[in-house]
């Protein structure tokens, strides 16, 4: 039996911000790595950013920077997002490190020495407009296999690997012009020559391990159709140089160098890296990828390893998944649809809630649509109504009626036989990387605990049979300890919090399951989560639905935003008096405001990532004064401040300053067209209604349908100086 688990998640491209769908792989690998450590298995979890290639070079041109600077910028963005999601890499590296260059070139030279490379001239698309050879993914056209739109390396619809010249009606993705064909010379990996070794390895691997059905199907179909020589060099500047004469101005194809990144990144932290990567007898290599990456991990990367004739650790378990999509739309920063990693951080919703929902719906066998309403329902009913409820009700009841001490009793309640079978089932799901099933089994155990508590009615028996009632509750407390261990791969912050309830008296280890070990006192208890409120979910749904969708909704409902604002919205200037951080959510500021009234107002806002407290105290800001009161993490909020956000997601609170007459706290903000009207104080409204007014910043001025917003008394225009153009919300 193999003793070690070497776990990788597909290296994310560094030239973008990851969205929820991109996070599936790193989160899945994180859960499996945490399970592996829980079982006492020596574990290494490796990931990093994929930084070379045309996509990076082109993005750098767009952002008017160098590829190196672009990679540095996005590496930090990726790293910060993964840290917020509490992903516990053993290393999160980069393919631009020195060891990567050495490793890629060394493997190439071994392939060449062993006769697994060829050289030949080929026809490649060249864009006359942009004066450059076009990378595969910078040519689009019709897939010759299924007829769908595809890029020049692979069709995402049917997963067929392509060459750009295979496409029907090809176009340059940059300028949309039709490219011409020019002759160029490249090095190819001779896959047909490796086919017998690859097929033999595939047969052994399929017999000894479990691959996702879709992965086996796609790989076998690819082998059945026949392997072809595949270019591993290209005409680019940004990449690993080819160590061969006549190829000084070419680099390695990113698909060739990227998988090797798993090895080179491991070298960065371990001098003993060969004990992981050249130890096939004792090491399980478990790789987490999306379905669009299957062939690169089942054919290309294994072929490189086999062709080198070295004893590389080969793929044991391929955990491929389908796509996580968004509200029947595509994730798109430019269109404003979908929620991305940096957006998630600003919602005020804890990372464990996001982790829970992604695992609960992990797209293991089919694509899944992220839906806000389902997000709220699953979190409130399963995570909070089921799991959190069991922890809270049992510990609170025990502490209230039986004190802090946890007696060491014999585990003998009748329910343990059923529970232990469920433990075995859960651990087997983990082992097979059926993460969604593992989580749902854990939730089923929690439901069983709730049912036992409800059926036994300890509130009725605590006085008549106190010892028996106490023993029942103690058994349930040991069940809660076990649940905190089993669920730790999915929601680690919450697991740690439950452990703190017990004074961190036990470890996240399977050796405690079903035992009476590791508990002595309940030091404190508190609610694990606050329910998600409908108004918050509706506001997030609207915010990330894209401007076009918002306009479509507005048109379909025949809403006039000017009339809506005049008749139903009340914006006011307020002065920030004090700011505190929410003790249960550090990202949330609690702002005490002077609104001209004797009592003032209080609002809660997710500003901690954007401002320090002292930057806002004393400033005049704008709030939606007539919003229905709401609670955020248990704190009452009596309004919402407004801010501007541009297309790059830069965010600034609108500060009302630099007027001839200082703004008066409580002064209303109105449309310029209403400056001579007598306006009534409108009734309380939902946040959805406010968003339908569609306030925008245009050339530094706040407007609705071209009409300026102004201060009611001084008639001064409301300005957005720091972000002159963008959405206001």
From Swiss-Prot:
Gene3D superfamilies, A to Z: HUPs, Isoleucyl-tRNA Synthetase, Domain 1, Methionyl-tRNA synthetase, Zn-domain, Nucleic acid-binding proteins
Gene Ontology biological process terms, A to Z: methionyl-tRNA aminoacylation
Keyword RNA-binding tagged: yes
EC number: 6.1.1.10
Main location: cytoplasm
Domain tRNA-binding: 565-670
Cofactor binding annotation: Binds 1 zinc ion per subunit.
InterPro entries linked to this entry: aa-tRNA-synth_I_CS, Anticodon_Met, Met-tRNA-synth_bsu_C, Met-tRNA_ligase_1, Met-tRNA_synth, Methionyl/Leucyl_tRNA_Synth, MetRS_core, MetRS_Zn
Keywords: Aminoacyl-tRNA synthetase, ATP-binding, Cytoplasm, Ligase, Metal-binding, Nucleotide-binding, Protein biosynthesis, RNA-binding, tRNA-binding, Zinc
Superkingdom to which the source organism belongs: Bacteria
PROSITE patterns: AA_TRNA_LIGASE_I (PS00178), TRBD (PS50886)
Sites where the protein binds ATP: 333
Sites where the protein binds Zn(2+): 143, 146, 155, 158
Pfam families: Anticodon_3, tRNA-synt_1g, tRNA_bind
Any coiled-coil regions, as ranges: none
Motif ('KMSKS' region) on chain: 330-334
Reaction equation(s) it catalyzes: tRNA(Met) + L-methionine + ATP = L-methionyl-tRNA(Met) + AMP + diphosphate
Keyword tRNA processing: no
Subcellular localization(s) per the UniProt record: Cytoplasm
Gene Ontology CC annotations of this record: aminoacyl-tRNA synthetase multienzyme complex; cytosol
'HIGH' region (motif): residue ranges: 12-22
GO MF entries: ATP binding; metal ion binding; methionine-tRNA ligase activity; tRNA binding
Cofactor: Zn(2+)
Function, in words: Is required not only for elongation of protein synthesis but also for the initiation of all mRNA translation through initiator tRNA(fMet) aminoacylation.
Subunit structure: Homodimer.
Protein name: Methionine--tRNA ligase
Organism ancestry: Bacteria, Pseudomonadati, Spirochaetota, Spirochaetia, Spirochaetales
Gene: metG
């Amino acid at each position: 039996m193999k003793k070690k688990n070497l776990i990788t998640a597909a290296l994310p491209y560094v030239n973008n911000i990851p969205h929820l769908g991109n996070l599936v792989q790193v989160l899945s690998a994180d859960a499996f790595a945490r399970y592996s450590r829980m079982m006492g298995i020596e574990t290494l979890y490796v990931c990093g950013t994929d930084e070379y290639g045309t996509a990076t070079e082109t993005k750098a041109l767009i952002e008017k920077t160098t590829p190196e600077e672009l990679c540095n910028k996005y590496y930090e963005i990726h790293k910060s997002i993964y840290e917020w999601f509490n992903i516990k890499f053993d290393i999160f590296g980069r393919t631009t490190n020195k060891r990567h260059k050495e490793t890629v070139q060394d493997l190439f030279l071994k392939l060449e020495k062993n006769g697994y490379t060829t050289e030949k001239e080929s026809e490649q698309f060249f864009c006359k407009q942009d004066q450059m050879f076009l990378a595969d993914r910078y040519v689009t056209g019709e897939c010759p296999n299924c007829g769908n739109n595809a890029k020049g390396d692979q069709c995402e619809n049917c997963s067929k690997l392509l060459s750009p010249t295979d496409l029907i009606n090809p176009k340059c993705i940059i300028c949309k012009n039709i490219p011409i064909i020019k002759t160029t010379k490249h090095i190819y990996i001779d896959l047909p020559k490796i086919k017998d070794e690859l097929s033999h390895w595939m047969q052994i691997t399929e017999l000894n391990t479990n691959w996702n059905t879709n992965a086996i199907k796609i790989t076998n179909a690819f082998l059945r159709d026949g392997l072809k020589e595949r270019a591993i060099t290209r005409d680019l500047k940004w990449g690993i140089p080819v160590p061969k004469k006549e190829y000084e101005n070419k680099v390695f194809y990113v698909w060739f160098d990227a998988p090797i990144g798993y090895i080179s990144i491991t070298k960065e932290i371990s001098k003993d890296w060969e004990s992981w990567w050249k130890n096939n007898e004792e090491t399980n290599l478990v790789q987490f990828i999306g379905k669009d990456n299957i062939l690169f991990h089942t054919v290309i990367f294994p072929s490189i390893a086999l062709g080198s004739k070295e004893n590389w650790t080969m793929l044991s378990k391929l955990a491929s998944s389908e796509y996580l999509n968004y509200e029947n739309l595509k994730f798109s920063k430019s269109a404003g649809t979908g929620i991305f990693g940096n957006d998630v951080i600003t919602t005020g919703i804890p990372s464990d809630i996001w982790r829970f929902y992604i695992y609960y719906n992990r797209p293991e066998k089919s694509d899944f649509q992220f839906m806000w309403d389902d997000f709220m329902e699953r979190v409130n009913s399963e995570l909070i109504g089921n799991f959190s409820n069991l922890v809270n009700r049992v510990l609170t009841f025990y502490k209230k009626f039986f004190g802090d001490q946890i007696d060491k009793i014999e585990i003998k309640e009748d329910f343990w036989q059923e529970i232990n079978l469920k433990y075995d089932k859960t651990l087997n799901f983990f082992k097979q990387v059926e993460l969604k099933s593992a989580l749902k089994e854990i939730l089923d155990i929690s439901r069983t605990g709730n049912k036992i508590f409800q059926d036994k009615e300890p509130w009725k028996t605590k006085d008549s049979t106190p010892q028996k009632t106490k023993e029942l509750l103690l058994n349930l407390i040991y069940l809660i300890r076990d649940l905190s261990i089993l669920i730790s791969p999915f929601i680690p912050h919450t697991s740690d919090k439950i452990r703190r309830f017990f004074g961190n008296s036990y470890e996240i280890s399977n050796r405690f399951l079903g035992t009476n070990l590791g508990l002595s006192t309940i030091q404190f208890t508190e609610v694990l989560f606050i329910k998600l409120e409908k108004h918050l979910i509706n506001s997030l749904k609207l915010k990330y639905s894209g401007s076009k969708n918002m306009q479509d909704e507005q048109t379909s409902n025949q809403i006039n935003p000017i009339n809506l604002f005049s008749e139903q919205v009340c914006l006011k200037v307020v002065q920030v008096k004090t700011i505190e951080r929410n003790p249960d959510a550090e990202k949330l500021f609690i702002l005490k405001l002077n609104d001209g009234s004797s009592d003032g107002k209080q609002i809660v806002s997710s500003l901690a990532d954007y401002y320090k407290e002292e930057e806002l105290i004393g400033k005049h800001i704008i709030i939606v004064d007539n919003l229905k009161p709401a609670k955020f993490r248990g704190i009452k909020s009596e309004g919402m401040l407004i801010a501007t956000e541009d297309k790059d997601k830069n965010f600034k609170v609108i500060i009302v300053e630099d007027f001839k007459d200082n703004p008066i706290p409580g002064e209303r903000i109105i449309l310029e067209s209403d400056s001579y009207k007598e306006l009534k104080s409108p009734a309380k409204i939902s946040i959805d209604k406010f968003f339908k007014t569609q306030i925008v910043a245009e050339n530094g001025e706040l407007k609705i349908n071209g009409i300026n917003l102004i201060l009611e008394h001084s008639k001064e225009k409301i300005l957005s100086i720091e972000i002159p153009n963008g959405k206001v919300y």
